[in-house]
Regions:
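Phosphodiester-processing cores and adjacent nucleic acid-binding clamps
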Residues: 1-194
Length: 194
């Protein structure tokens, strides 16, 4: 507290959709009640929702634990983002309506810009939907390392985990050098036109 830092407790989840597809979502606790709901969701995902060792959430569990939680959409990896990128605007509106019904004034469309494929398409579609639906937005960054000069080390760790080498021309490149912990000033500059 003396350092001017406020702790925000939250968790990233994979959400199992009814059609067996997965999306990502982040929950942030607003209070002790929200924290209890968050821990209940984490426990249930591990105890009842594991698929191949991966804990997954189900919508019906979320409905029962929505009080005092804020939700970040998951960006292009969330259900709304996946629909937007696939050109399914009606499905995106429907997904957004579900979230805003269960989390009124507590659901935020994430805006991200890391120079990766599809980010600009998602960004423009998400802003348009947010304006249309009067949904708040939040600028986030998919942080994987602290500083830009740590990108190569991160890539080496990914290659080790995948059993590949850095010079393998066929290896997938899922990350960019822009996925570092940006300062507030950098984020404001990046999204100044929004």
């Amino acid at each position: 507290e003396r350092a001017g830092v406020k702790l925000i407790v939250g968790a990233d989840f994979d959400l199992l959709e009814s059609d067996e597809k997965r999306s990502q979502v982040t929950f942030l606790a607003q209070s002790h009640v929200g924290y209890r709901h968050l821990t209940l969701l984490i426990s249930r995902a591990y105890q009842e929702g594991q698929v191949l060792g991966k804990p997954l959430l189900r919508r019906e569990w979320i409905e029962a634990c929505s009080d005092d939680l804020r939700v970040l959409s998951g960006g292009r990896h969330g259900d709304v983002g996946q629909h937007l990128l696939a050109g399914r605007d009606s499905d995106a509106r429907q997904a957004l309506a579900w979230w805003t019904t269960h989390f009124p004034d507590r659901y935020y469309l994430e805006l991200q810009s890391t120079g990766r494929e599809y980010h600009e398409d998602y960004l423009h579609a998400a802003v348009a939907l947010a304006v249309e639906a009067d949904c708040p937005v939040v600028a986030t960054n998919e942080v994987c390392f602290l500083a830009p000069d740590e990108f190569e080390a991160h890539e080496a760790r990914v290659c080790i985990g995948d059993g590949r080498t850095l010079n393998d021309p066929r290896r997938p490149r899922h990350f960019s050098e822009q996925q570092y912990l940006r300062s507030a000033e950098e984020m404001q500059a990046l999204f100044a036109d929004i």
